[in-house]
C-alpha cells in the first residue's frame, strides 16, 4: 500500500532455520566454522553459594546471602579483581532473578529490561585463592566472568533446594515471583492429586 514491506522476525528466523521454504535459485548465505585451541589457555575456577528465602504465598525470592571464592591466579590489582567479581555477581543475579526477554506477536519487547539495583542485592561475601597459572609469565587467569557465570546456577540450586520438600523439581529462569509461585502451586496440586488417587 505505502510501498513498504514488512516481515516478522520469527518468520525470518524460521525461513533461515528450515531453508526448504527458500526459492531454489536463491542462495541462503555463507557458513564458516573454525576452532581455536590456544596453547596458553588458563582456567580460573571458583565456588559460589547463594542463600535464599522464598515467600510461599507470593513466590518472591529474597537473596539473603551470597558467598563466592574465586581463583584468578596471581592477583595484580585486588581492588579491580573484587570489582570484577561484584559486577559479575550483579549481572548473574539479574539474569537469575529479573531479566527476561518477552516479545509480543510482532517480535517487539513487551517490557523494559529489569536489572537489580544495589539495594536489591545482599552484601557479597567474597574471597580469592591463588594458584598461579603456568601458561603465562605473570601467573594470571581471568576473573571478569566469574560472578556472571557462577551466580545463576548458585541461585537456581538454592531455590530448588528450598522448594524440594514441596515437590518442586525445576523452575525456569528468571526466577520471577510468578514463575516460582506457579511451580509451588503445581507441585502442591500434583501432591493433592496423588493423595486423592490413593
Locate the predicted segments by residue:
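C-terminal catalytic domains of large/alpha subunits in multi-subunit enzymes
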Residues: 1-198
Amino acid at each position: 500500500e505505502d510501498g513498504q514491506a514488512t516481515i516478522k522476525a520469527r518468520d525470518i528466523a524460521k525461513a533461515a532455520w528450515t531453508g526448504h521454504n527458500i526459492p531454489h535459485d536463491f542462495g541462503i548465505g555463507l557458513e564458516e566454522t573454525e576452532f581455536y585451541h590456544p596453547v596458553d589457555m588458563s582456567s580460573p575456577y571458583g565456588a559460589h553459594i547463594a542463600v535464599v528465602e522464598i515467600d510461599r504465598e507470593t513466590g518472591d525470592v529474597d537473596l539473603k546471602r551470597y558467598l563466592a571464592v574465586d581463583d584468578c591466579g596471581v592477583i595484580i590489582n585486588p581492588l579491580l579483581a573484587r570489582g570484577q567479581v561484584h559486577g559479575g555477581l550483579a549481572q548473574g543475579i539479574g539474569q537469575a532473578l529479573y531479566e527476561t526477554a518477552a516479545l509480543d506477536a510482532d517480535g517487539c519487547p513487551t517490557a523494559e529490561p529489569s536489572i537489580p539495583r544495589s539495594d536489591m542485592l545482599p552484601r557479597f561475601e567474597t574471597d580469592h585463592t591463588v594458584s598461579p597459572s603456568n601458561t603465562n609469565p605473570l601467573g594470571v587467569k581471568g576473573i571478569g566472568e566469574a560472578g556472571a557465570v557462577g551466580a545463576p546456577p548458585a541461585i537456581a540450586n538454592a531455590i530448588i533446594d528450598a522448594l524440594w520438600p514441596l515437590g518442586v523439581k525445576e523452575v525456569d529462569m528468571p526466577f520471577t515471583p510468578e514463575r516460582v509461585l506457579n511451580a509451588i502451586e503445581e507441585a502442591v496440586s500434583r501432591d493433592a492429586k496423588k493423595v486423592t488417587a490413593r
